[in-house]
């Protein structure tokens, strides 16, 4: 069955794709930009912007317009906050892989970048507002949840603090 094959293909290749993005943006670039600017906020915002611009060529932008770049930039910011507050990339790696896996397996549309034989298919006329909903409401709730679950402290220093060469990002 095609869905069985899709499940295993997605299970193998989507974590590779999302891990590559996370290692490049939240690993390599965030650390390199942090060393260059000697602070944490510049790499957080620059890598978020770069992450958004990487997705500029996705068909969702063509369908819904450049307003959708807000979604991608703020998703990058969300992943960056998870990485800095948790002192590691595990949460952003898992969330990114889970998000793309869900889109691939559970629901997709003719106008999305992941053209798969998913369980559900959206056939309605898309609205940018429904795609922006997660970044303005769901992501902040997830950050709040993780902050309580993992007892995140020292937000100001972790997100906006100075970097010295003996500190890690």
State what each model feature region is.
Residues 1-2:
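Short, small-residue-biased leader/transition segments that mark boundaries at the very start
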Residues 7-167:
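Transmembrane helix-loop-helix hairpins at the membrane interface
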């Amino acid at each position: 069955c095609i869905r069985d094959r899709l499940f295993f293909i997605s299970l193998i290749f989507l974590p590779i794709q999302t891990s590559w993005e996370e290692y490049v943006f939240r690993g390599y670039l965030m650390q390199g930009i942090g060393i260059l600017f000697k602070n944490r906020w510049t790499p957080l915002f620059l890598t978020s912007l770069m992450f958004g611009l990487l997705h500029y060529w996705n068909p969702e932008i063509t369908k819904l317009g450049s307003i959708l770049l807000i979604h991608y930039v703020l998703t990058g910011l969300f992943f960056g906050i998870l990485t800095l507050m948790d002192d590691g990339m595990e949460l952003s790696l898992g969330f990114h892989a889970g998000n793309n896996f869900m889109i691939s397996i559970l629901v997709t549309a003719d106008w999305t970048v992941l053209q798969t034989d998913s369980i559900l298919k959206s056939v309605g006329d898309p609205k940018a507002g429904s795609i922006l909903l997660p970044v303005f409401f769901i992501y902040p709730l997830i950050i709040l949840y993780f902050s309580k679950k993992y007892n995140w402290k020292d937000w100001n220093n972790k997100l906006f603090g100075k970097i010295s060469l003996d500190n890690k990002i």
